[in-house]
Regions:
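Glycine/charged-rich beta-loop-alpha catalytic/anionic-binding loops adjacent to active sites
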Residues: 2, 41-47, 87, 115
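Short active-site-adjacent helix-start/loop capping segments
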Residues: 8, 30, 60-64, 70-73, ...
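Generic hydrophobic, aliphatic-rich segments that mediate packing or membrane embedding
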Residues: 17, 38, 57-64, 86, ...
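Conserved N-terminal alpha-helix of the aminotransferase class I/II PLP-enzyme fold
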Residues: 15-60, 67
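Short, contiguous strand/loop micro-motifs
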Residues: 4, 25-27, 91-93
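PLP-dependent aminotransferase-like
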Residues: 70-118
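N-terminal glycine-rich, Lys/His-bearing helix-loop that initiates the first secondary-structure elements
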Residues: 1-12, 16
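General beta-strand structural signal in soluble alpha/beta enzymes
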Residues: 1, 31-35, 52-55, 92-93, ...
Length: 118
């Protein structure tokens, strides 16, 4: 869905994208299954073990940190700041803790992590 940016900050989309959006809007989907199937499709394209679509870079950072710290535990998803989880350090090379609209460190903390700059 790339195109020229406008003063409004949006991109024009192709007919194929519009058709896909229309199809999505006119049909019902079980969201959990859609997420699983979409992740599998993207993982195959990327030759990766798995994939997950997120809404933004911030969401991706927070969710990735939560997944690593929680080691797949659903408990951690609902209790990201629990004292039961002691290994929270996320090592970032100096200069990578940048502010892209929000500091990387803030999103690491959202996922329950603690930044350690190396």
């Amino acid at each position: 869905a790339s195109g020229k940016m406008t003063i409004l900050g949006v991109s024009k989309v192709s007919e194929a994208v519009l058709a896909a959006q229309r199809f999505g809007g006119e049909h019902f989907f079980e969201m959990s299954e859609l997420s699983v199937q979409t992740g599998a499709f993207l993982a195959n394209l990327l030759k990766a073990e798995d994939a997950q679509i997120v809404s933004s870079a911030s969401a991706g950072i927070a969710q990735a940190v939560a997944a690593l710290i929680g080691k797949g535990s659903l408990y951690h998803a609902y209790h990201p700041y629990t004292e039961k989880i002691e290994q929270r350090e996320i090592i970032l090379p100096k200069g990578h803790n940048v502010d892209y609209g929000t500091p990387v460190e803030v999103m690491v903390a959202q996922g329950g992590g603690q930044v350690v700059e190396a």
